């Protein structure tokens, strides 16, 4: 398959670097057959056109997700500091700021009160602190069913050029609490427990207490949910791409559920309730 990136907008080098890291870890990422970096042209092996998202159902989800978890563990086991940009406080904060800037101010056309701003600021500080306290590994950053291909070996992994070195729970929450498909909480817990058990056996630095690992997983997911709400609004209003706002209720549901389970996040739960009453 040919990849032709506009020279003025795209740098192919991160893609090539992360592809090499994935393949070295034993993950099925596209292999580069030929390249012309000056013209931003790549010739890649084809992983097919069947995404996880296009075929996922109740009957096959466990099999597909078990394969995805195995590939994720291989990727994380290959982690080395200095290979990828850090998922640091500045990046986490920029992502969280997308929520008030694009979802609240632009989509809802609301101005937060000083009390609401403080509640959001305090919550973001908690989320960032917990994220940075997690062990750091390679993070795909969009390890979700739309970017996993049904292939042999399974899965094929794409859209990895924004990979970073950061919180160990991030890719798992991207996989199991997706933008475009939702699962029962019991099933998400089962997948998280399967990952945690296998990761522990293989020597990854997950918390030895599953309840603490799951708390990290949930709080990391909340940071991602706020980010995605902002991104989807930005895609709609700035980039003029329709369809994304239709999936924002799923992320509000994720965020509300997590915020409602933890006493420290109660101010965010109240803020979400207030925002939902003002939906356009």
What residues fall within each predicted segment?
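Regulatory N- and C-terminal appendages and interdomain linkers associated
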Residues: 10, 206, 238-280
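Active-site acidic catalytic loop and adjacent metal/ATP-binding pocket
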Residues: 32, 75, 124-174, 179-186
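Active-site activation/catalytic loop segments of kinase-like enzymes and analogous catalytic loops
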Residues: 98-107, 168-205, 219-239, 251-258
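Active-site catalytic-loop/activation-segment of kinase and kinase-like phosphoryl-transfer enzymes
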Residues: 87-127, 190, 194
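Histidine/acidic-rich helix-loop-helix segments that form or flank divalent-metal centers
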Residues: 206-215
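Hydrophobic packing residues in well-ordered alpha-helices of helical domains and bundles
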Residues: 15, 61-68, 92, 117-120, ...
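Secondary-structure capping and boundary motifs in well-ordered enzyme cores
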Residues: 64, 91, 135, 140, ...
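ATP-binding pocket architecture of kinase catalytic cores
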Residues: 1-94, 98, 104-109, 132-133
């Amino acid at each position: 398959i040919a990849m032709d990136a506009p020279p003025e907008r795209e740098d192919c080098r991160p893609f090539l670097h992360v592809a090499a890291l994935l393949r070295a870890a034993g993950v099925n990422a596209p292999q580069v057959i030929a390249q012309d970096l000056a013209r931003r042209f790549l010739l890649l092996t084809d992983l097919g056109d069947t995404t996880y998202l296009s075929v996922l159902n109740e009957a096959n989800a466990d099999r597909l997700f078990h394969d995805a978890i195995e590939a994720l563990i291989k990727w994380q086991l290959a982690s080395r500091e200095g290979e990828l940009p850090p998922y640091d406080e500045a990046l986490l904060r920029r992502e969280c700021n997308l929520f008030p800037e694009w979802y609240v101010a632009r989509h809802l056309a609301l101005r937060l009160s000083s009390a609401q701003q403080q509640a959001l600021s305090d919550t973001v500080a908690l989320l960032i602190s917990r994220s940075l306290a997690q062990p750091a590994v390679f993070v795909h950053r969009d390890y979700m069913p739309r970017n996993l291909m049904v292939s042999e070996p399974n899965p094929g992994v794409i859209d990895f050029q924004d990979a970073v070195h950061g919180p160990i729970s991030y890719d798992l929450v991207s996989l199991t609490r997706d933008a475009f498909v939702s699962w029962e909480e019991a099933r998400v817990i089962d997948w998280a427990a399967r990952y945690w058990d296998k990761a522990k056996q293989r020597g990854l630095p997950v918390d030895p207490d599953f309840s603490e690992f799951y708390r990290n997983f949930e709080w990391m997911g909340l940071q991602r949910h706020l980010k995605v709400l902002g991104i989807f609004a930005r895609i709609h209003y700035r980039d003029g791409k329709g369809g994304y706002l239709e999936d924002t209720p799923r992320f509000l549901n994720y965020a509300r559920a997590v915020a409602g389970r933890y006493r420290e996040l109660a101010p965010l739960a109240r803020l979400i309730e207030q925002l939902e009453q003002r939906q356009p």
